[in-house]
Structure formats: structure tokens, C-alpha cells
Amino acid sequence: MTTETLTQLEQHELFIRRHIGPDSAQQQEMLNFVGAESLEDLTQQIVPESIRLNRDLAVGSACGEAEGMAYIREIADKNKVFKSYIGMGYYGTEVPSVIQRNVLENPGWYTAYTPYQPEIAQGRLEAILNFQQVSMDLTGLDLASASLLDEATAAAEAMALAKRVSKAKKANIFFVADDVFPQTLDVVKTRAECFGFEIVVGPASEAVNYELFGALFQYTNRFGEITDFTELFTELKAKKAVVSVAADIMSLVMLKSPGSMGADVVFGSAQRFGVPMGLGGPHAAFFVTRDAHKRSLPGRIIGVSQDTRGNRALRMAMQTREQHIRREKANSNICTAQVLLANMASFYAVYHGPQGLKIIAERIHRLTDILASGLTAKGVELVNGTWFDTLSLKATDSEAITARAVAAGINLRIDSDGVLGVSLAETTLREDIAELFDVILGEGHGLDVAALDAEIIKAGSSSIPAQLVRTDAILTHPTFNSYHSETEMMRYIKRLENKDLALNHSMISLGSCTMKLNAATEMMPISWPEFGNMHPFCPLDQSEGYTDLIEELSTWLVDITGYDAMCMQANSGASGEYAGLLAIRNYHISRGDAHRNVCLIPQSAHGTNPASAQMAGMKIVVTACDKAGNVDMEDLKAKAAEVAENLSCIMITYPSTHGVYEETVSEICEVIHQHGGQVYLDGANMNAQVGLTTPGSIGADVSHLNLHKTFAIPHGGGGPGMGPIGVKAHLAPFVAGHVVVKHGRESDNNGAVSAAPYGSASILPITWMYIKLLGHQGLRQSTQVALLNANYVMKKLSEHYPVLYTGRNERVAHECIIDLRPLKESSGVTEMDIAKRLNDYGFHAPTMSFPVAGTLMIEPTESESKVELDRFIEAMISIRGEASRVESGEWPADNNPLHNAPHTLADIMDPEFDSRPYSREVAVFPTAAVKLNKFWPTVNRIDDVFGDRNLFCACVPMSEYE
């Protein structure tokens, strides 16, 4: 019989062992190799003593998975899921089970990274290309992005694009129609203030009265009205204004496209295509423009190119527009977007096809017609005379109606002046219409849904003006007309998944990306209706579960970061940067220091840093780094003194982007504070801080957290993400607010940075579960093992590749950089060759050429076992051996396994392969481990230059697949 106690047998800390890859024996073996006695000893060797956290985090102790699920079930049950007719950009939708099970709940889709390595990402690239095709077909425009964060931020991007491309160069006014969604206007105003644009709000028809660089209209508008903008757009374009339209994706199935009216930009939320409301997100926004503006399009674009065999292949196009290359000159700061949700929406369109979508849209519209017919027959006056799915009612007894609605478990939209709104959705049934009659009219109305339907059919009239009915065909590509049975759809999704390498196959060691385990238990609650079916603008007493979860999570994150308050609104890390910089900006303005607009940024910073600073209206001054990769203190002091009068802040990353804990970090903060500035600490590398130190104790004033890195939200192939910001008390009054939802906080009336008050709220349960399950013990140990894994990999590889930077005691933090420049000089083998060759070994490449060109940055995370680390190390050593054969002249520089990587099945089946100076086995089975678990790239190396010179960003003809 065991002598263990009951507490030990209950295994409350079991999840820690599930999350952390190396077991205790493996950890000790690795510690012995790197020269440390224990994790604590290693921590003391690496983390500067002056910043170490000498207490347990106040997040509670670890708990078991079943226990954690019980806790979050109690929280979820506090949410009251009413039938929502609020609309305003958020609607009930049916998530097809085949998509929920095979995409949303499938680690093959949700654990992949942004497709920077396209040869091993052809599946999700095709799904995103489908999303772009849906966007282009429905909007009637030429070129779509791969997704933006939400509809409101897409509106702000449309405004920025309009300013870039408008030929009305002297104009500084952006017009916004007064019937757009209020949250959209709120976000646009926030962005415009930083850019110095003047926002004019008024009736759409008045736009022609101003000298504009751009204008924004809603189609259909917030009250449900459908407007033909053709003449207005013609007038505006004659005045050189760029016209943008916020459009409802479901209505576009039936309505004339904005592009055919003359719109230059069309955007909106794809939420209605099979993505739950989730208290506001995550949802993909579509963004489409004309070909003439392609260089100004924000975000990723998926394009068609060819590989070295001349076969069709997909990849991210025109990356020179983006923040990781153009930095402060980029079109936007977008990095993480909403790819997983865009993929769900694209699969929704594929599954239903054009006819299925038309039936869904027509059913929604018919139910709206029936509701309107019944209400008007009983004397109810409608504000709008046309509609797709939304009615606005002039109600003389709105309080009584609202009371009946609440009693029936129904939420209506309450506008000013006694106007009530009703927006129907895919989830609305005929029984719901009968219930709405009871709520709005009271009992005894005598209306019958079937009879009203028959009358509408007999009358043959329409609430959609004839000239606004869509007449052109949509989604004609075979992809949208082939997979309508569940069997075919399941297999199509699986075929695409098989082309992609995600965490369910092997380690993804991307530096500064933290590709850790996204545990199944953490993921499960996001599929629950108690979290998924909540409207972001529902009454607060209905979302008590969400409120409790967010407040507790905020309390935990405050303690983890050492800050005083959290703002949970930003939808990505880059969005969090922008939100944090806005807090700094508004803090200075409140003190009469509006002139403080200079942001110091080290040359090693992430590309989003200068891009975000530019968006916040700041001027960037770059500071140098020394030979060790640290911030050059003398240069920093000189530049801080030089711009002292106008210094707003500095943006630093900790540990640094060079993968070390800089000893001078607190001194950096002191220098900035001495000159009246604030310190923004980028949270991208927070996985090396949790439980060991805090940004607040270091001396920072504000940080964003990448919940999709440090706190286990999956990357989803390029999103979703969350970037909440932590702030010191003096900045708390200046964080983002929201125009619709008020919480009685000092920041309520501040401008918003996202459409919803809590951003992508429905993925916050993942982070809540992560912290709850690990507890203070697991969080600290996770960070320590992340350090151990990185130092183990670094020391193993240092015998074969030079390590670019180390910190105190020749250690690195949670990531290391290997320098490939000497190898390139001696052999001609490039970092690109090594990255593509790793695909043949079954690995995604580490981060290439950041922060230093010609390097690889490796971040293994705590979730990878010693077995997996050794497999990666073996691959890297084997590749170095292959490079040696090129160095020696045994293999030609232009015909060797690295230069020709990656290799496909077609390669080894090709009889001409025999002419190569290496064998088929060397090409595709270079180690014994690869033979046991082979991943096959489906295309050869892709020609990016060809793709950008021959830009094509739509679904290709089916003949290309043959």
C-alpha cells in the first residue's frame, strides 16, 4: 500500500506536469548539461538580482483539470443567454458542426502560426484565399486582405488608407455618416485624433458639402435602412474623396454590391458567417479595395505564385508594405489578425455555397418582412422604409415592451427618443416572430406568421428597392460549389489540414512567438453557448459570469505584471501597443504637455513598435544597440537629453529581442523618467518574466500582454490574439473606454481601440484556465523550464553554430540567436536554405533575420520535452554537416539538399532526381527520427518575386489543380 497522503494522491499539481514538457528526470539531465544544480540555481545565474521577484504570485495554488472545469462551469452558468435582437454588428449564427469539430476544435488548425513558411502552410493559405474570394465577390471590389481585427478598427484602417491614396492632398476632413454603428465612429475618432484629422459627422447626403479626403457610410445603416449611394459616390469621387463603406456580409448576398455603386473600400465583420458573438469577439473583419490601392492595403494579403517546379503555390504577398519590414512607414501596425475566424467564415461559405447562403439570407429577410407586415398592420410606425434584417420602431410604450421582452428572455435594441430596434439573424425561427409579436403588441394581436407569409408572397412586393437587388452571380468558383455534404466538407478540411505543419506535429521554435501548449482543457469552454452566445451590448446583469471572469483574470494579471490596473480591450499585441501609447499620450495632454510626442525606440525593436508609435501620433527617434545587443546607454542618455522637452516615452522589450536580460533595464527606466517620459515595456517576451520578475518592479509604466503567447491562447494560423494592457495607477484614467457599454469607471468616456468593450472576450476563458490550472507554482516553474530549454538548446548548438548574444554567466533568457553569417560566407548556404531544409526534417523554421539579418532566433518554450528538443538539435547539427559538404566542394553550391529544399513526394518520384549529387534518402529521410514521423511539404520553394510581379490574390481556376 502506498504511503502517499490523500492530498498527494489527489494530484492537484498534475496539470503542471502535463503542461511542462521535460519531466523531473529530463530536467535534471538538462541542468547537469548546462551546469546548474537546480531550476532555482539556473534562475539566479540568469535573472539579475536587482529585479528578481521574491514572493509567490497571488493567483492561488495549482488545481486539477476536472476541478478547473468545475470552477469555470460555475462562472459560465452565471451568464444569462437571452435571445438577442440587438444587432449593431453582432448576430446569432449557426456554427456548422463539421466546422466546429474539424476547425475550431482541431489543433491542426488552431495551433499553427502565421504562414511565414508557406511551403508547409498551403492548407490554411488556401482557406484564407477562399476568404479573400468571398470578400471580393460580395463587395464587388478587386483585392481583399486576409482579415483585420474587427469592423471598427477596419473603419479606422479605411480612413488611413483614404488619406494615403486621396488626390485631395490639402483636405483634412474625414466625413462619417451619422447612421454608422456608434462603436465604429468611436474607434474612428480615436484614430483620427492621433493623426490630426477632422471628423465631421452628419446625414450622408451632406458629405458633398465638405472638402474631404474620404468619407464613410454604413450599408445597411444602424436603423436598417438600405440606401442606393451611386449618385452620392459619383459626386464625392468627382471631388477626389475616397469612399468607404461598412457593409453587412449577410445582406450582401442579396444586395447590390457597394463596389458597383462606386465605393473604393468596403469592409465589415464576417461574424455572421458561422462565428459566435462571444461578447464581442474574436471575429474576422473583411477589407476590400480597388487594385489601384493595392500598395496601401493594410494587413496580410495571400497571393498566388509558383514554386521552383513551376507549380502553383500560395504565399503572403507584398510583405514590403508591412510593419516587420517598413516599421514606422508601414500601412498599419497589424501583425496578429483573425485568421482562424476568417478560415471558419470561409469554410462556412464553402459549405453552404452561393445557393445555401442565398436561402439563409432570404429566410432572414422574409422573417423581417413578416415582422414588419404584422407590426404595421397593427399601427406600429417604422422608422425605416427599407430593410434587410433590421426594423426600427417608434414605440410609445417602449418601457412596457422592454419589460415584456426581458420577461421573455429577449434583448431588443434601445435607441434614443423611444425608438426600439429589432435585428433578426440566421438563428431566428418563425416561432420567434410570433413571440416578438407578443412582446411588442401584447397578447390578443391575432397575427399568424403563416398567413402573413402567404400575403407577402401574393403581393409580390419587396422592402428592398429593385435597383438594390443583387443581380450578378457570386461565389462561382468550383470550391464554393463542390463541398455541400458533410462527408465532402470533412474531407476537404482534412486535405487542407494535411498540408500544414502545426504544433500537433512538431515543435515550432519561432523566437519571440512563444508557441507553447494550448491545452485541450483550456480550450473547451470557448465552445460553450454560455460564452459564445452573448451579445457584447447586452445588459450587464446578464453577463455576470463574464464580469467575474474578467475581473478575476485582471486581478491575477495585475499581480503577475506588478501594475495597478488592466484594460482588456485590445485585440492583439500590436493593438495593445497602440492602446498603451494612447494612455501615455492622453496622460501628457492632461498635464498640459501635449508637445511631448517623441518616442525613443531601440533599433532592435519589433516592427510593430514604431508602427504603433506612428499610429499614436508620435515621432520616432531610434537609439543604438551596443556590440552585445543591449541598449547603448550612452546613446540613450544623449538622445533622451536631446529630446527631453518633447520626450513622451521609450518602447523597450524585456528580456531584449536579443534574448538576454539586460542588466541596465532599471537604469533605462530611470533615465526616461528623469526627462519626463514614460516607459512602455513590450510584453512580447513576458514568458521569461512570469513569476521571476515584473514589468512594474523593473520600472515600466505600461505594457501589453500577448495572451496568445505567454498565456496559452493559440495563434490560430495568424490570430486570434488578445493584447490587454497593464498600467501604473497614474495612467489608469487614460485607458480605452467604450461609447456603448459603461462600467462606472473614470476611463468610461475615453475613446475605444476596438469595437467591443472587452475585445475578443470569448477567448479569455483560455487564459483564465491556464492560470487557474498552473497556479503560482506552475507559472513560475513554466518560466524556469522555458529558460532551461533555451539554454540547453543554445549550449548544444553552440558547438556547431556561433551564438550571437549571451547575458550574465554566458546564459540566454528564453530564446537564443544563432549567427549564420559566417556559414553563408564560407559556403553560400543562407538562412533561407536552412529554414527550408528544416521543413524536410519536419520542423517549422525559427524566426529568420530578426532582430539581426542572417540569423535564426530559437524559442523552444517550456512545453517541449527533452526528446523533442534533441530531435530539433539533431536536425540542426545534421544540417550543419550538410553545409560542410557544400563548403568542401563535395556538393555544388547550387545543387544540394539545402539549396533545393524543401523536397516533395513529386521530387523523389521524378526519374531525373538521379542526376542530383545526393540520394533520395538524404533528401527526405535525413535522420532516423524523420522516418518515424515524416511531414511532407506539398510544394517546393516558392518564388516570392514572381508572385509579387504577377499579383493574383483570388481563387485560381480548377485547371491549376489538375
Swiss-Prot record:
Pfam families named among the record's database cross-references: GcvP2_C (PF21478), GDC-P (PF02347)
PTM annotation (N6-(pyridoxal phosphate)lysine): residues: 709
Record's function text: The glycine cleavage system catalyzes the degradation of glycine. The P protein binds the alpha-amino group of glycine through its pyridoxal phosphate cofactor; CO(2) is released and the remaining methylamine moiety is then transferred to the lipoamide cofactor of the H protein.
A GO cellular component entry from the record: cytosol
EC number assigned by the record: 1.4.4.2
Domain of life: Bacteria
Protein family according to the UniProt entry: Belongs to the GcvP family.
Co-factor requirement: pyridoxal 5'-phosphate
Cross-referenced InterPro entries: GcvP (IPR003437), GDC-P_C (IPR049316), GDC-P_N (IPR049315), GDC_P (IPR020581), PyrdxlP-dep_Trfase (IPR015424), PyrdxlP-dep_Trfase_major (IPR015421), PyrdxlP-dep_Trfase_small (IPR015422)
Organism name: Shewanella sediminis (strain HAW-EB3)
Complex and partners: The glycine cleavage system is composed of four proteins: P, T, L and H.
Recorded name of the encoding gene: gcvP
Principal EC category: oxidoreductase
Keyword Cell cycle: no
Cysteine pairs bridged by disulfides in the record: none
Gene Ontology terms, MF aspect: glycine binding; glycine dehydrogenase (decarboxylating) activity; pyridoxal phosphate binding
Protein name, UniProt field: Glycine dehydrogenase (decarboxylating)
